[in-house]
Structures are given as C-alpha cells and as structure tokens.
Amino acid sequence: MKAKILLLVSIFFLSVTIPQAIAQGLTGRAYYKSSSQIKIAMDSTKMAPEQMAEIQAQLKKQMERDYILSFTQTESNWKQAESLGGGPATASSGGMTMVINTGSQDKILYKNLADQSFLREEEVMGKEFLIKDTLEPSEWELTSETKKIGNYTAQKATYSRIVDSQRFSTGMTEMENVKDTIRVTAWFTPEIPVSHGPDNFFGLPGLILEVQNQGRILICEKIELNPSTNPVKIEQPKKGKVVNREEFRAMQEAGMKQMMNQYQGKPGEGNQFTIRIGN
C-alpha cells in the first residue's frame, strides 16, 4: 500500500514539475492574421447606401494585417509585421474620405506577466506617447468546447464586460457617451503552457491562438517554439512621453473632438475624418 502511495505521489510530482520545467525554458513566436468587419452608420442624407457599402468593402480589404507575438514564459512583444500595406486603411466615395488608423508598424506592445505591467507605444495628433500601467485581467470563463487550430487542440474561453465609451452621433455632429457590452471569444491551447495572447489578451492556461472581438478576428497561422537560428529577444518600447492609461484616454477624447470639428468642414469641400481602432 505504501509503495502504491509513493508511486502515485511520484507520478503527480512529475506531472506537475515536468510541464513547469518545460514552460520555464519556453520561448517562441506566433504569427497572426487580423481581419475586421466594418460597420459604419451615418445619416442617409449625407451618404447614399451604395457609397457606404463601397467604403466598407474598401476598408475591410485594407484592414487585413499580419502580426507577430514574441514570448518567453513571463514576457511578450506584440507588433505588426513588416509589409507594403502597413499604413492606415483609406477609402473614399462621392467626396467623402475615411481613414482608419490600425496602428503603425513600428509600434510595440510589451507585457510582463510576472509584475502584471505593460508598455505600449501610441500616437495622438502626431505626438508619440508611451503608456505605462498595470495589466487589467479578464474574468475568463472556460468551456469544454474544443477545436483544431493548425496542429494544436484549442479550448474555448469567453468573457464579457460593460465599458463606458464615446462615439459619434448619427449625423456626426457631436459625441455621445454610451455603455457598450464587450463580448470576447478566445481559443487557447494548453499544449503551449504560457499565458500570453495577441494584442491586449492574456491570462489563459495556454497560448491564445484565436480571438473574436467586436467584428475583429485574430487567428494564429504559424508558431515557432524555441527557435535556435533566430533566438527570441523581448524588446521593451521606449519612444514617447510616458503617461498612464487614464491620461492617454483623455488625450484620445480630445483628439476625437478635434476630428469631429474637422469633419464638419465647409460646405462643398468634401470631408475626411480618421477613426482609430487600436493596434
């Protein structure tokens, strides 16, 4: 009986320590593709439905992006991959030009899970900022649903929360304060035992391979684990004036108000406005 107990204890010890030992030395790169569904509601007297459909189709195509997540056990970098089409998504029809800024190629998001901190390079009205603050963990709910993503078995997790946000009124004449419910679905694989994920997402018991968030889909297409020819190096962003999360949100709000004023423009000139949706 004592021998059986010792054997069970030994098996349990190995089952716990071996994955931990593997994870402690684990590094890698995950390559993601981003796509977005664009839905923009405007006053029908300002733009015909055909014009809006044309703009939305142009933006959807241009907003496809490639990203790279580099990671160790506790740190990660998230940045856009180099490409010829890495600038803002731009569409125009009938004198209206719309620009959606999805983040510059050289902007970096750094996350440190050990001390629950992050650094993120951002830009508002041509000025560079470095957001430095604590990570906001999500209350993930794990499900039993699984599917294959590439060679990995992924498990489904979800969360939702209510946030305060601002958006343009239908006529694009003023800003409205609204309550939005954010619903996120993620698929993670315990086969890669790190709690990292694309963009702002993290905190699951395995690498997040896919995220569905408000019309945006991020999906992992390739993974390199412990690469020997090009070892993983985690870079901390340094460019820009250091601000916290709330200070940056206030600057974004001011930028949105300025954008609204620019949109109103002079009659007959045509209008251009920019929407920023994050990195």
Where in this protein do the model-derived segments appear?
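Extended soluble regions of mature proteins
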Residues: 25-279
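Bacterial Sec-dependent N-terminal signal peptides
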Residues: 1-32
